[in-house]
Amino acid sequence: MEKTFLMVKPDGVKRGLIGEIISRFENKGYTLNRLEMVTPSVEVAEAHYAEHKEKPFFGELVEFLTSGPVVAMEWEGEDIVAVSRLMIGKTKPVDAQPGTIRGDFASTMSQNVIHGSDSVDSAERELSLWFAEVASHVS
């Protein structure tokens, strides 16, 4: 069965959207395997956004992601990577359709409530990155 990484970003946590987001995926029949709330380190945030390292907004992304707790999750189910991307909606809130998570809750391009892996390969990399970070916080 396919797995993906989903993360409720600091703005979604602050706004109390964790339950709403989890419910949407549970209602689709997907299985939540792992969930951890953690405030990301700068190193993990930089690794997460590595493909944007040379872009002018990279520092802003890292600063935002490390500004508070996030909810890191591993979800499993048939075609979950593709379906979760449809459920999440477009990155820019103005382009996100009503009924998608971003269409319903996102306010700006950077504060868009949720991250979801965009491919199976990205999911594997992100799950390894984020759950290694979580494990390092367990004493």
Swiss-Prot record:
Catalysed reactions, semicolon-separated: a 2'-deoxyribonucleoside 5'-diphosphate + ATP = a 2'-deoxyribonucleoside 5'-triphosphate + ADP; a ribonucleoside 5'-diphosphate + ATP = a ribonucleoside 5'-triphosphate + ADP
InterPro entries: NDK-like_dom, NDK-like_dom_sf, Nucleoside_diP_kinase, Nucleoside_diP_kinase_AS
Positions contributing to ATP binding: K9, F57, R85, T91, R102, N112
Pfam families: NDK (PF00334)
PROSITE patterns: NDPK, NDPK_LIKE
Functional note: Major role in the synthesis of nucleoside triphosphates other than ATP. The ATP gamma phosphate is transferred to the NDP beta phosphate via a ping-pong mechanism, using a phosphorylated active-site intermediate.
Protein name in the entry: Nucleoside diphosphate kinase
Organism field: Exiguobacterium sp. (strain ATCC BAA-1283 / AT1b)
Gene responsible for this protein: ndk
